Regions:
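Short catalytic micro-motifs in class I SAM-dependent methyltransferases
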Residues: 111, 115
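Conserved acidic residues
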Residues: 105
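Class I (Rossmann-like) S-adenosyl-L-methionine-dependent methyltransferase catalytic domain
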Residues: 1-40, 46-102, 116-131, 136-210
């Protein structure tokens, strides 16, 4: 989907992933100290996970291709009196967004990775690598292949996560989780994978381009 397509989904409120609160899986990550500033929320949508970090007093920036989603995130930040910067941009080319100012120590991806075509996955992994240094942690939550049906985003296997992040990253763990959705979702609660992925020593290779 293009930025305009995501904008239209938000305008029509056809956004079952937007539950008005953080995903429970990421709340647990935050509770055990898994969010360390500065934090990057990649594909932040309407901002709930960036705002979770902000509510903990952490420096955080969120990026999304949808102008509509970013406007909603900014409005939430104002309403809640929280400090978080939200930027319209392409997460496949994060190094082209000057306002990001890497490196980030934590990246969260909540429902972004599972929207990509196969060819975009390694581009995304390299885009995130360009924003981080050795030891940074990516927390990734995506639909798993155990979610029945074909509605919604692509289903992702553990092997696909591991292969995508085999360069510049090390997958430390992949745990079964669920992906909370709104009542716009007609099926059972989606099954998900929660991966903890650590940045390896920075290499000298260029970021792959589409």
């Amino acid at each position: 989907m293009t930025g305009g397509s995501w904008d239209e989904a938000y305008r029509q409120n056809n956004v079952p992933w937007d539950i008005g609160r953080p995903q429970p899986a990421i709340l647990r990550v935050a509770e055990w100290g898994g969010l360390v500033e500065p934090v990057l929320d990649s594909g932040c949508g309407s901002g709930e996970h960036a705002l979770l970090a902000a509510s903990m007093g952490l420096e955080v920036k969120g990026v999304d291709v949808s102008q509509e989603a970013i406007e909603r995130a900014r409005a939430k930040a104002r309403q809640r009196g929280l400090s978080a910067e939200f930027i319209v941009g392409d997460v496949l080319a994060l190094d082209r967004i000057p306002r990001l100012e890497p490196p980030f120590r934590t990246v969260v991806d909540i429902g972004c990775f599972h929207t990509f075509a196969n060819a975009d996955r390694p581009v995304y992994a390299s885009s995130l690598a360009a924003m981080t240094d050795t030891g940074a942690v990516l927390h990734l939550l995506c639909f798993s292949e155990h979610t029945p049906g074909t509605d919604g985003p692509r289903r992702v296997t553990q092997g696909e996560i591991t292969s995508t992040f085999s360069r510049d990253w090390e997958v430390e763990s992949i745990e079964p989780e669920t992906f909370a959705v709104s009542n716009l979702w007609s099926g059972p609660t989606p099954s998900a994978w929660l991966a903890r992925i650590v940045r390896r020593c920075r290499g000298s290779s260029a970021v792959p381009r589409r």
